[in-house]
Amino acid sequence: LRMAKRANGVSQLHGEVSRKMWNSYDGICEITAITNAQNKTYWSDPALDEALKRDDNNAISQRKKELKHKLFRVVANQTGKLFDPNVLTIVWARRFAAYKRANLILSDFNRFLKIARNKKHPIQIIWAGKPYPEDFGAINLFNEIFWKTKDLPNCTVVTGYELWLSGHLKKGSDLWLNNPKLYHEASGTSGMTAAMNASINLSIPDGWVPEFSKHGKNCFLIKTAEDSLPQEEKDKIEAQNLLDLL
């Protein structure tokens, strides 16, 4: 920061947090913010995009079912589990980094099971991603989710997050789950590309999300705990807030 002429965060919140972290140091450059973006031409499904432009709910619903069929073929081929395109489908898919809290929704497992087994309001959940080879904490997290959900027919873990798989997950999901520790996600662009494909963000208001979010209109925001609380307590509170929303 002392050697540079300028620096920027990759979302407005990231810029704000970075200034709080570094502005007490003498001789550093100005820290601004330039929010990351994604290429709509690459990520959006053309037929779905046309339906969204026309505000044609029937066409949107029909195309989403077609895209879910494609995603669920991938899921079936890898896991053997058969998902229903008529059921609300939640996807958590990204790097298995600890701060992203892939297992937050499972924290109160008994309450999670009640939601997962609710026949009146059924859901399906897909986790996808890869931990780094020697990140044993992330590997344990991945394994924990697998073992906790392996006997649930409507929950599964898919290995990988290559571009083609990422595209299927965003196009075939109904809800895109994003629950990092607050102030830890610099930007996080997966929710942008999910939104391009009529997948609603269910998210902590971190990274780029506060610049986009209108709770109950274009997304659902998970209420965050007080900043002053210990992280373990924050995790418990935010897990309950997530389950409340579901």
Question: What are the functions of these language-model segments?
Answer:
Residues 1-246:
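Catalytic cores of carbohydrate-active enzymes across secretory and cytosolic contexts
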